[in-house]
């Protein structure tokens, strides 16, 4: 059984609160979905805004390998000739191979929203579908609010489908627009629908009851051959069916022909691309494509996974382009530590006392407030230290930081930093002294310190110019202590090729930030040296 995937991220997904895709964003997403193997891409509603019109103009010259672009619109307006309906005429100008039309299935909407008669609504559906069949290879009919309409007035809801089928619709998509229908209802209603229409059926599920993916799978079980959804489940209110779950479930769990199986490995990257372009943080525990979808923390779990991953993983993470993560925390056992050390490329025997020493140190540090989830660079530096493999690239000699606020001016911070590097590093670069004492300003004390220490070290390690602080999180650990509370700072950094996290803990937020900053730069230098060594060996 072959299932067609219809992506509506660029229209329904863009209706999510706070999401607005630029034209360039839309084109990047379209290219990524085509590469993934998606069959249809709904580009937007040409009659609703200039940005969607620009998108359809832009894609006219693009040659997609897999997907067909669809333009979306409503049926003609009540009591208006189809040739005179502005929305329909704008839709035709999009010149897409597929037109998707939504019409009313629920008598409540016909009478209250459209404010027309039930008979006129049927004419609107027929006129629009039959007219558009003259201009496109394919017309998809979206039956808006179909399941609610069916429950309210079964006979009328079915009539709307029959009319669309008679007009020539290539697929009838049943929409759970309010997201209130449950899987068993989906199955029962589709069973009945199949007795009255012969056209292929599709499903468009919203997630207001948290069952959009389940409803989509239920529809397929009962014969739907067309599934609609969005990447990461983006959409209005609670979102749409998440294609990042729907697709692998159909392929890996139900054994259906959807996209090429080898293309599933691209799913993780597509999910993260859409998250980045939408400006919405990626949900870390999202099934299949979340960063922590295959993360293991408990020592017993890790021990079992080492023997056979099937013990705690429902699929191989690599099938969807993801990876297994072994977390380090106070819950970690020997298995976690061993696995992480091996991931870093260090050889260590299982019986080595160093393993238990590292585990003991982790538990001591976590008791002080350290947390190594999300700070794997700090964990690696700790391991290097305890294995005698931590190189000293620089020595911190001191810093001063102050915040200045004048009466009529914005406040700013100034930091001075003094560092020392090994003599041989200074000599190799032609510097007379291995010291650097410098200052920098920033909007706040942490930014000032960050700029100052980079300025000092870039003189000796030019590659640090590529490093940027990309995220900064602060957590107060013992709030009852008030202003004396211990602070944990988590910093995320990137050099354009890698991302890594470091952590610092102190009652002084500046000191905690300083620790995390220094470890971030030290980790970068370790990785640069490793990369250089690997290049020389190859």
Swiss-Prot record:
Keyword tags: Amino-acid biosynthesis, Branched-chain amino acid biosynthesis, Isoleucine biosynthesis, Transferase
GO biological process: isoleucine biosynthetic process; L-leucine biosynthetic process
Domain Pyruvate carboxyltransferase, residue spans: 3-268
Top-level EC class: transferase
InterPro entries to which the protein is assigned, alphabetical: 2-isopropylmalate_synth_dimer, AIPM/Hcit_synth_CS, Aldolase_TIM, Citramal_synthase, LeuA/HCS_post-cat, LeuA_allosteric_dom_sf, PYR_CT
E.C. designation(s): 2.3.3.21
The keyword Chaperone is assigned to this record: no
Pathway the protein contributes to: Amino-acid biosynthesis; L-isoleucine biosynthesis; 2-oxobutanoate from pyruvate: step 1/3
Domain of life: Bacteria
Reactions this protein catalyses: pyruvate + acetyl-CoA + H2O = (3R)-citramalate + CoA + H(+)
Gene Ontology molecular function terms on file: (R)-citramalate synthase activity; 2-isopropylmalate synthase activity
Family annotation (SMART domains): LeuA_dimer
Function: Catalyzes the condensation of pyruvate and acetyl-coenzyme A to form (R)-citramalate.
Family the entry assigns: Belongs to the alpha-IPM synthase/homocitrate synthase family.
Name this protein carries in UniProt: (R)-citramalate synthase
Organism: Thermotoga maritima (strain ATCC 43589 / DSM 3109 / JCM 10099 / NBRC 100826 / MSB8)
